[in-house]
């Protein structure tokens, strides 16, 4: 199964310094809290959204104590009673680059104003809130270190449990699934291959076609993405750009 996901080419990783890790953990705290306060409740075994949020947090090396604090807050054991709402924004800038920005906000007006301000500087207007641009497909992604499993064994399990694609990079295998088959495939990998650690494990948005930016333009857009990601209300930034040096 060849690499059609574009995942390795377009994902935008932050630096692994303390400030960046703290920002990531803050965002994951909110995601776990929102999942736990949803209709599924605070028990991961009966709440698929919460189970996924915790798996995603663990893949990002979020400490167990932080995860437990998010669950405690959801159970009403914390003093901060902020309520977060998910808002999805989209915009297309010059060059055909399309962005999908997922936010969790306790002040929708503030968040909308901030996101619009970022895109105003790119001479772009926001699309209809909550709309997913046709340039993106909603998919499940799991990334596993090559040190944990051989390709043949992984391929057999994944093919039998709904995987759409397996991509081999220098250090890892990246499995793509439909949203519907994600949990089944993940459970099969965990039980049949004794995998407990994932480098990535989430429901995400993948571009079905990309545009390429190079040189100075690429650097400016990377700086723009970093600014978006640094906003406290922004959980995820997805785009359809491939950067070439």
Curated annotation (Swiss-Prot):
Compartments in which it is found: Cytoplasm
InterPro entries xref list: Integrase-like_N, TACO1_YebC-like_2nd/3rd_dom, TACO1_YebC_N, Transcrip_reg_TACO1-like, Transcrip_reg_TACO1-like_dom3, YebC-like
Major subcellular site: cytoplasm
Family per similarity comment: Belongs to the TACO1 family.
Keywords recorded for this protein, A-Z: Cytoplasm, DNA-binding, Transcription, Transcription regulation
Transcription regulation is among the record's keywords: yes
A GO cellular component annotation in the UniProt record: cytosol
Any one GO MF annotation of this record: DNA binding
HAMAP family listed in its UniProt record: Transcrip_reg_TACO1 (MF_00693)
Source domain of life: Bacteria
Organism placement in taxonomy: Bacteria, Bacillati, Mycoplasmatota, Mycoplasmoidales, Metamycoplasmataceae
Entry annotated with the keyword DNA-binding: yes
Pfam families tied to this protein: TACO1_YebC_N (PF20772), Transcrip_reg (PF01709)
The organism of origin for this protein: Mycoplasmopsis agalactiae (strain NCTC 10123 / CIP 59.7 / PG2) (Mycoplasma agalactiae)
Name of protein: Probable transcriptional regulatory protein MAG6590
Swiss-Prot/TrEMBL GO biological process terms: regulation of DNA-templated transcription
């Amino acid at each position: 199964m060849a690499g059609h996901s574009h995942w390795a080419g377009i994902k935008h990783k932050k630096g692994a310094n303390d400030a960046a890790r703290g920002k990531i953990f803050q965002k994951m705290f909110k995601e776990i809290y929102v999942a736990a306060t949803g209709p599924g409740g605070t028990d991961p075994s009966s709440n698929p959204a919460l189970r996924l949020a915790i798996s995603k947090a663990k893949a990002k090396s979020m400490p167990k104590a932080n995860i437990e604090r998010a669950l405690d807050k959801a159970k009403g054991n914390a003093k901060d009673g902020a309520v977060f709402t998910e808002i999805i924004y989209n915009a297309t800038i010059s060059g055909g680059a399309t962005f999908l920005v997922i936010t969790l906000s306790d002040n929708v007006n503030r968040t909308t104003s901030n996101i619009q301000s970022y895109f105003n500087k790119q001479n772009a207007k926001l699309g209809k809130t909550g709309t997913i641009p046709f340039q993106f497909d909603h998919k499940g992604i799991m990334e596993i270190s090559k040190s944990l499993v051989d390709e043949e064994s992984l391929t057999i399990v994944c093919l039998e449990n709904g995987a759409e694609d397996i991509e081999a990079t220098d250090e890892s295998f990246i499995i793509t699934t439909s949203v519907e088959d994600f949990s089944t495939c993940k459970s099969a990998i965990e039980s049949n291959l004794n995998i407990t650690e994932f480098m990535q494990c989430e429901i995400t948005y993948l571009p079905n076609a990309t545009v390429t930016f190079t040189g100075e333009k690429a650097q400016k857009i990377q700086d723009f993405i970093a600014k978006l990601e640094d906003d406290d209300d922004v959980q995820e930034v997805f785009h359809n750009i491939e950067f070439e040096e």
